[in-house]
Amino acid sequence: MSLETLMQLKTRQAQRRDECIAAGVLPDPNRPGLLEDAAKLVGTCMDMCPEYERVEREVQKELDRWEVVPGTTHADPTAAVKIYRRPAAGRELPLPEDVRPPAVLEKTLNYLFHTLLPSDPRDPLFAAVQPFLWNRTRAIRQDFIVQSDRGRTAIACHERIARYHILCLHWKGGVGADAWSEQQELEQLRKTLRSLIEYYDDQRLLGHTYPNEAEFRAYNLLLHARDPEALREVELLPCDVFSAPLLQTALHLRTLIQRSNMLEKRGQSRNTESTPNMFTRFFRDVARPDVSYLMACLAENLFSSVRVGALKALSPAYLDRHHGLPLAYVVRMLGMDSEDEASAFLTLVGIEIDSGAAKINRAARINEDQSLPAPFSALVERKRGDASCQAIIDRGLPTHAHMQAAPPPATRRLLSDAAPKAPAPPRAQAPALPHAQAPTPVALPRATPTPPAPAQVPPQPRPAAAQWPPPPPPAEPRRPRVPRCLLYTSPSPRDKR
């Protein structure tokens, strides 16, 4: 495309904007008005990228390598995807032809996750396309916001985007993603989950419910594990959502994550009083089959904090002359993958290692006033099994046992030319990350079956003389017991007013 074509499109854009303002489709910037009187914007762009943006970015050499015709610098209309642009003061509202309707947004998301994203997260292409997908999924959410769309399609797309961010958080952007930012990934995950929660609340007021609400409420609770406001939101949920096994499991893990010995600083969570510090049980329960793969990925982000809390809780229990704890014991206790990982972590926080033993005692000075990187845990990765990225993102089933491997997506030839595939390591080995070692298979603890309660003999009727005073009214039926969770109860209807 030439500069002349761009100038023609720019002139047509200005004329089209005047027409939309005159027709009331867009608000007049020179005439004040009420927000409730503004017309709802409905997108009419049927391409993944509007024509004007596609030409503009081609002229300005801003096209990504996934958006051009292979071997040229020209935009491919079937591969270009609308870029995210941060809203700025003075920026004009987009025209309807620059905004994609929900059906096109869903089609764009299918293209990103089924054509560009490889099926195996160990594939180098996973890291190669991660920055592109991070930006384009953000633009998809922006188009939903501009149109004030909170319907079924918006919720389904946000759910898939949230699962993708959790997957990237566990894989640290993919193998070899040196420029990946954990802070930026967490920021977009929080915003996606916040939008989802608002959508669920709005739809409930209209009488609509969604089957995946408990799943994403559980993710949000683990993402804000030490935020009391997140717990308050969960306590106000309807009983059917609150009692869902996924949400109850998240509540259980959240209780085990709490600490009472954190170094308190401004902007960080406060300590929790009367914390049991059941760190060993936390890592054991994360390995349970009923903890889903994505839920374990979010819990993994707190492994370092829980391990520091465990060391601070253990230190006062040992005298200075204690010989130390064997590294093999520390590995089992703190859910690590190898003694090398344990040695590196203990050295980082200031624990001395001597003859294969960790000097955890009263004299140890644990250095927690630093940024501890989140580990890549083979304990978590084992839960994925053979599930593909598409199976995890599109279906998000509760446990890895129900996940089936999806066929590899139809990948464009450009992908294989841009990043050569490396041979995948055997499944018995841990993923080829610098900080992940092949773990020794650990047998998961089996749950002991609970024997059935003995049958109760119905009480015999008392004589008529003993019926005064009259018996109390029958008790309100109790809520169904949710197995393997702590004793959480939803507030009564009177407390929800």
Where do the model's predicted regions map?
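Amphipathic alpha-helical repeat scaffolds of TPR domains
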Residues: E106-L117, T153-H170, N212-L222
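Short coil/turn linking the two alpha-helices of tandem helical-hairpin repeats
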Residues: L167-G174, P228-E229
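Short coil/turn connectors between adjacent alpha-helices in alpha-solenoid helical repeat scaffolds
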Residues: P124-V129, K172-Q188
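Conserved small/polar residues in nucleotide/adenosyl-binding loops
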Residues: Y488-D495
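N-terminal alpha-helical interaction modules that lie
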Residues: M1-R150
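Alpha-helical scaffold segments of alpha-solenoid architecture
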Residues: E182-F345, D354-S355
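Flexible helix-coil transition and linker loops at the boundaries of alpha-helical arrays
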Residues: Q142-R152, D201-T209
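Long C-terminal extensions of eukaryotic subunits of large macromolecular complexes
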Residues: S274-A430, L444-R446
